[in-house]
Amino acid sequence: MIYNLYIFDKYGTLMYYGEWNRLKQSGITKDEEAKLMYGMLFSLKSFVNKISPIDPKEGFLFYKTNKYALHYVEVSSGLKFVLNTDTTATGIKDFLLQLYSKIWVEYVVRNPLWTIGTPATSDLFKAKLDEFVRASPLFGPKII
């Protein structure tokens, strides 16, 4: 089950936030939550790179608690995709890379009205992203 998605640029600016099956709110503003998320990712990525006993080619990819899993993909441009799911979700790296190439590149990067470094606000992008997420087998409630 997909809970929410953050997309950050290489400077930590929140480019997009989407929410689908999130059951619990954090109690803070979305801006504060995004800053906490980016700070945590920055620290965790640094920690993994420094403490890893082997060369971490991909570095930090995800972490899992007993309630949710956080998945992380960074593309070559420095754009960071963070997806929170239930703990049984698999294939998230491929899902996020497809989201990047099929949705972000097509409906944000190729949009002549979008300015690099500004959040993605296009209604077409939002609609296509929502369609992409809802069409994924990851979207719905897990069957117990």
Which role fits each region the language model picked out?
Residues 1-4, 10-144:
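Acidic, low-complexity cytosolic segments
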